[in-house]
């Protein structure tokens, strides 16, 4: 009886330890905010250089995120967090979702998501460790998660 209770207790401890690690990975280190008030891993967005600027634009009937491809070379930049500036230049509300498409179904995937009003700008800070370890490949995809028909783009990471 004592061994059974001990075994059940030990099993519950393992399950809880795994669950807490899972929640920690799901939360990730991705932070969304304004330039003045936002921060990631203890560094203010104001102190960081913007690595890429992305814009929701309308070209005729085409609604897209521009530029379609952005390259970040980690071999030549310091190990500081990645800072993205996303701006909605369109007339309607648009979403911005960035994730690793290769393992998007995983509970551990890195994911950033924000909704932008017309003319609104937000900053997305991502720890370098999340860019390397919470992604499977070298490519992140971004798109408007509010309107699936809109054209998205890719961030290519040179590691």
What is each PLM-predicted segment?
Residues 45-81:
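N-terminal edge beta-strand
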Residues 69-71, 79-81, 91-93, 111, ...:
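Extracytoplasmic
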Residues 1-58, 131-133:
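Extracytoplasmic entry segments of secretory-pathway proteins
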Residues 66, 102-111:
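Short beta-strand and strand-turn-strand segments in soluble, beta-rich domains
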């Amino acid at each position: 009886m004592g061994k059974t209770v001990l075994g059940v207790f030990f099993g519950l401890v393992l399950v809880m330890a795994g669950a807490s690690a899972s929640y920690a990975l799901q939360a990730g280190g991705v932070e969304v905010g304004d330039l003045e008030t936002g921060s990631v891993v203890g560094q203010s967005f104001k102190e960081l250089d913007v690595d890429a600027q992305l814009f929701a634009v309308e070209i005729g009937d085409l609604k897209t995120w521009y530029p379609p491809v952005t390259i970040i070379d980690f071999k030549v930049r310091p190990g500081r967090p990645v800072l993205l500036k996303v701006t909605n230049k369109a007339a309607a509300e648009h979403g911005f979702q960035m994730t690793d498409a290769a393992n998007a179904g995983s509970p551990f995937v890195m994911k950033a998501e924000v909704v932008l009003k017309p003319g609104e700008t937000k900053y997305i800070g991502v720890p370098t460790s999340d860019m390397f370890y919470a992604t499977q490949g070298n490519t992140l995809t971004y798109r408007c998660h509010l309107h699936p028909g809109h054209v998205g783009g890719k961030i290519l990471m040179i590691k």
